[in-house]
Amino acid sequence: MCDQQQIQCRLPLQQCCVKGPSFCSSQSPFAQSQVVVQAPCEMQIVDCPASCPVQVCQVSDQAPCQSQTTQVKCQSKTKQVKGQAQCQSKTTQVKGQAASQSQTSSVQSQAPCQSEVSYVQCEASQPVQTCFVECAPVCYTETCYVECPVQNYVPCPAPQPVQMYRGRPAVCQPQGRFSTQCQYQGSYSSCGPQFQSRATCNNYTPQFQLRPSYSSCFPQYRSRTSFSPCVPQCQTQGSYGSFTEQHRSRSTSRCLPPPRRLQLFPRSCSPPRRFEPCSSSYLPLRPSEGFPNYCTPPRRSEPIYNSRCPRRPISSCSQRRGPKCRIEISSPCCPRQVPPQRCPVEIPPIRRRSQSCGPQPSWGASCPELRPHVEPRPLPSFCPPRRLDQCPESPLQRCPPPAPRPRLRPEPCISLEPRPRPLPRQLSEPCLYPEPLPALRPTPRPVPLPRPGQCEIPEPRPCLQPCEHPEPCPRPEPIPLPAPCPSPEPCRETWRSPSPCWGPNPVPYPGDLGCHESSPHRLDTEAPYCGPSSYNQGQESGAGCGPGDVFPERRGQDGHGDQGNAFAGVKGEAKSAYF
């Protein structure tokens, strides 16, 4: 029935094509639609016994197209359909690509010929022409050449090897989210059986656990490969759980330095993992240097700083800034309850106050710049906001200043030989105003008041603080903080520490010049000392503070000075450090 016959285009065309259905993927724009395509000099329609109408195919003389041949079995015979046109006649069996070359389609069709289509996509370059195809009786096959658009194929990114863990179906599934501060705000439901160590559930008990188990979302103190409670203690590097702001106290005496051995542990905000790998159906776990595994490899998030101060309740610091860590939890092995989020690492700028700890006075707005300006570093987020009126009594209030002193302040401060002063420093030393306003000093000053230049005197030391007392009021004892401030940056208060340079003439003071002993939490809030027994490093006589005096920071209890506050006068240089 299906005799071999040759059908050619009746028009002298270089290329012919037929109209037929396409079977591209459902994403293809050609899917389930009649597409008009062309193939180089080919006849596409083969008919078997039944009569079929004349097919009209639109031809675009185009660039060479890739043609693919479809074989359709037609009952029992095979038809060789050779397309002949006024081009180089060349017979190609099955697949081939030729520009303006005839190709042979080997068509076989089964009983009721089902059309199969292969695709070639070409770019139109000339106007569309028409050619007619003659059909013999019997079934026919419409073959269309179209190449499915490549853009429909979106390659899936290769999965990155990540650490995986698998949460128990109904045990300790996280309910909550990771905030931008990398604090897991939420709870693990039924935190009795945690991510199990072997086959047993370890409850969160006050003892050290030999194998890590995540529980009750409390701050945890990691010791080697175990997580243990540290509610009243400080979090060390790498511990996980409700991260509050942790600062790296390099050499301050507020907190003891963190243990050296804990530096080796990976610090990550990912939940603590079981130490053994999860099911073999997942990707193999990659041990992170022999330490407990996480869902993702623990990031060395440098800004997770630690101190060993007792933790304070996060009362009013809801919007914290400062050190953050990066979280990446993405893996088919991870439970879906832990949303893959990314917590950007934000290196805290030096000396920037946290805006969430309440309105605080602009420290340094009332001080003549005794020290070079260093970028503000963030106050600890867990430090409750302190206002000037909330801070302890300042020495000015303990020692009532004489009335005429505030008005005589500009005269002794007139500088006959001005010298460059360091940039403003956010300190809590109430020092120099053009006209001190005693009534307004207890109130917070968020905006620094403009001062008429740096006030220096040709005397051995410039007036650095308000000349409000005929004599400095020695502080009998340091004013204790209401509560220990667990961060390197204490809650700032307006300290009006006496200075030997109060009056028009510097007054040398013996001993500590009436200044109180440094408290570990007030290293940055005290006025600099000057005198024979204090910080007259720039003076030999020690009778006062001169223009070239060096005002180093007080030494902390651990022997380390506040490196972020080491300053000098004209001859000094500013040092800075992260906290």
Swiss-Prot record:
Expressing tissues: Expressed in the upper layer of epidermis and psoriasis (at protein level). Expressed in the upper layer of epidermis and psoriasis.
InterPro entries: Keratinocyte_PR (IPR052881)
Phosphoserine PTM sites in chain numbering: S394
GO biological process entries: desmosome organization; establishment of skin barrier; inflammatory response
Compartmental location: Cytoplasm
A cellular-component GO term for this protein: extracellular exosome
Disordered: annotated span: 526-579
Top-level taxonomic group: Eukaryota
Biased composition annotated in UniProt, kind: Basic and acidic residues: 551-561
Induction pattern: By calcium and in psoriatic lesions.
Coarse class of the protein's main subcellular location: cytoplasm
Keywords: Cytoplasm, Phosphoprotein
Coiled coil start-end: none
UniProt protein name: Keratinocyte proline-rich protein
Originating species: Homo sapiens
UniProt gene name: KPRP
